[in-house]
Amino acid sequence: MIQVLLVTICLAVFPYQGSSIILESGNVNDYEVVYPRKVTALPKGAVQQKYEDAMQYEFTVNGEPVVLHLEKNKGLFSEDYSETHYSPDGREITTNPPVEDHCYYHGRIQNDADLTASISACDGLKGHFKLQGETYIIEPLKLPDSEAHAVFKYENVEKEDEAPKMCGVTQSNWESDESIKEDSQSNLTPAQQKYLNAKKYVKFFLVADHIMYLKYGRNLTTLRTRMFDTVNIVNQILQRINIHVALIGIEIWSKEDKIIVQSVPDVTLKLFATWRESVLLKRKNHDNAHLLTGINFNGPTAGLAYLGGICKPMYSAGIVQDHNKIHHLVAIAMAHEMGHNLGMDHDKDTCTCRAKACVMAGTLSCDASYLFSDCSRQEHRAFLIKNMPQCILKKPLKTDVVSPPVCGNYFVEVGEDCDCGSPATCRDPCCDAATCKLRQGAQCAEGLCCDQCRFKAAGTECRAATDECDMADLCTGRSAECTDRFQRNGQPCQNNNGYCYNRTCPTMNNQCIALFGPNAAVSQDACFQFNRQGNYYGYCRKEQNTKIACEPQNVKCGRLYCIDSSPAKKNPCNIIYSPNDEDKGMVLPGTKCADGMACNSNGQCVDVNRTY
């Protein structure tokens, strides 16, 4: 059995309180000096790691003893993590450095179950923790031949710019509070409930622009550490809504910027999102990317992101200004913008969390917390129910993982039976969190065919059919997995008004109802002739952002035209068009376009047997 190493470090408080000192976090007016003394007790035969899996720090703050428990953030990096920078002559240099034994930790104060600490132990101890509602920062003093560290309150750091920073999202066109409440509390379909219950992962890519490279002294290691410190906190914040953020790669524009980074945030966001879609996604598959920039945005803006953009090639992006020396404030801004990508709007005055300010507050203050408000949680849930973004459901298979397995990162890898997180957070009675092996007598730890650590009997229904294109799924009695079965693509459905396509029955009528409401229906054929125009209200596909007009036989595979029979809406040729998502309102692939014909993913009406 693998034993988790516990390291105890006593921090002796130096009998001195400083009045003012310049530290990495800025000019600090009041601080305490502490000296870490490390005491290690390795189990017999244990392998010494450079950075232990678990550590405990004991020290004194304002004369009161504090015990800080830390555990390595094992889910911080993805298994195929990569780093890219550029040589002086502009050559792209990409490496896959080992990241299993890293130095980034999450933690908590003893007798407080809430995770309130984020610490890096790479070069001394640097990070922050919360104690009795106050945010404290610890960092090395960098004195010659000394282990001295400073501990101080965030409020004692002199602020370079007292003007509060804000998010640039100002007009969301989001649903009303009532509709969100109805969506999140309404009866869910089996497919929606299955989606909500599934674990979710964001494979995250972070880019630093050239100004960041210059700002951190042209030192790749220093900038890399800044990026890691920031994402470590973002990961911790998003875990509160059951989103695991795995850093899949970083890129540093060390030679020059790959876009024109401007002080106008919406222009920079659009340029970055376009570069991500056209360049980065083709090079590195990921779910979401942000640009960390050293430029000062116009006004008080600290960041900007597309609302509800997650999983969309053009819109799963955000930009964040490196606006403060204290990285946890930059991390909160980044988590805020990712919150927008995940469907959350700004908090209103009526929104609450167990803190003075919640993550999605429109203004970033020194009271910023890691907590999402009741409104944010409701909006996020409603967004997931309505859109069910698929990319965040994907986690790697054992055979996909090429790096050594890391027990505790929530990914079941080669050599592991289960992975329920760290020993402190695991609540799975079937899984031994220390070894990632099943406990004695257990056959399984998770899966729809697993019940109280045992396989369900053969023939047990594990998933009901959701519609006529689905099939009831049965347990085999030999596995915890519930194999997903469904009707073959092309099977007629809904009284021959459609054909099954990837377990759904897409029809134009149902798509109109989803877009315009229960009184909507598909328009007459004449409306679809607009798809021969090749402009925003009528096209079949795009090539390099150019809209391609439909051929006559393909007009029903372009923009969807609907008629709304409501008294106030009598336009017979209604469409949905959004400049932020031009493909919204297009006829979905697999939709019936004629007898025996269905739309393919290229906007063509082809024989139903060739569509798939």
From Swiss-Prot:
Residues 404-489 form the Disintegrin domain. It comes from the Eukaryota. InterPro entries: ADAM_Cys-rich (IPR006586), Disintegrin_CS (IPR018358), Disintegrin_dom (IPR001762), Disintegrin_dom_sf (IPR036436), MetalloPept_cat_dom_sf (IPR024079), Peptidase_M12B (IPR001590), Peptidase_M12B_N (IPR002870), Reprolysin_adamalysin (IPR034027). Residues 21-188 form a propeptide. Glycans are attached at N219, N502, N609. This is Zinc metalloproteinase-disintegrin-like HV1. Zn(2+) binds at H336, H340, H346. GO terms for biological process: apoptotic process; proteolysis. It is an enzyme of class 3 (hydrolase). The active site is at E337.
